[in-house]
Amino acid sequence: MENCFDSKKYLDVVIQTIKDKAEKTKGKLYVEISWKLLEDDFAQRILPGYDTDNKKKMIIELKRELDILMCVNASAIIENLPMTKKAIPCVQHLEHTLKRIETVTGIKPHLVITNINPEEMYDIIYNIEISFQKKWYKVWELYMKKWFPYNKSFLLSENGFWNDDHIPIMKKIALITGIGNGNWKLSTCIWQIYQDHEIGLESSYVMFQTFPIYGLPPEHPINQAWAKRRDCETLSLDDFGETTEEGAQQSFNIIKDLLWDVVEDDNLIKHYEKASDMIICPTLECIENLEEVEKLAKKELEE
């Protein structure tokens, strides 16, 4: 099949955009990966020419400036919930994913265990932490926050964010990824930006994703096929007439609510007027044959 997607252009734009945003950030730049870190089987199916190693190449290109944080919810670990289509237990999947990231990228990820209830979970979580520390992983704790993200006064107090570990990011950029639902990737970014600010580091946030495509309407076959793949993620038009998905819109609202009054005026966050402003997604500009991609997306919807 003829290539419909310029993978080199896509990779170049993503890398340069991340570098540009990092240069505009005085502290650390936290880059949330909205889907899987290393592969995207959906993109491969509907974007002929999409390089399966795109994200790997991006990470390797930025390697000297990059740390990776892997987030997982404490409840998923304790219950050892099944992950992936093969129902691999959480702890086993976590071990495999961490090892694979390190093997593929040469970067040893930090492990961030989130949503810990210390009154009920601490002994079990402590033992899990020890097992990963014996494999030379740095392990960090984020505690349960009741009524997050609505209890702003509590979150911005000594009993809120300051109870969590402040992860010492040594590089300029931190990629934030995770496994399982409710992994608290966004929360991890917010905790870090807030705590960085309190010690004089003016850090910021962006999200990196391949889909949905904001320059196409919600009902476009490409966006609908992606929504089906993500189990009916809600797509709609925002106040600016751009496609937005529910998760990204919620993230945008939370970031603006919790960090707007914290960060300085020249922070990237202060310049985000809509969800798409905080998202790196050059997919549309790299599609060379939109008609053919539409056909593949429609086929995906029919299956």
Please tell me what each predicted stretch does.
Residues 181-183:
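Walker A (P-loop) phosphate-binding loop of P-loop NTPases
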Residues 187-188:
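Hydrophobic positions on the alpha1 helix immediately C-terminal to the Walker A/P-loop
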Residues 1-175, 192-303:
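Flexible phosphate-sensing "switch/lid" loops adjacent to ATP/NTP-binding sites
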Residues 177-179:
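Residues at the beta-strand->loop junction immediately N-terminal to the Walker
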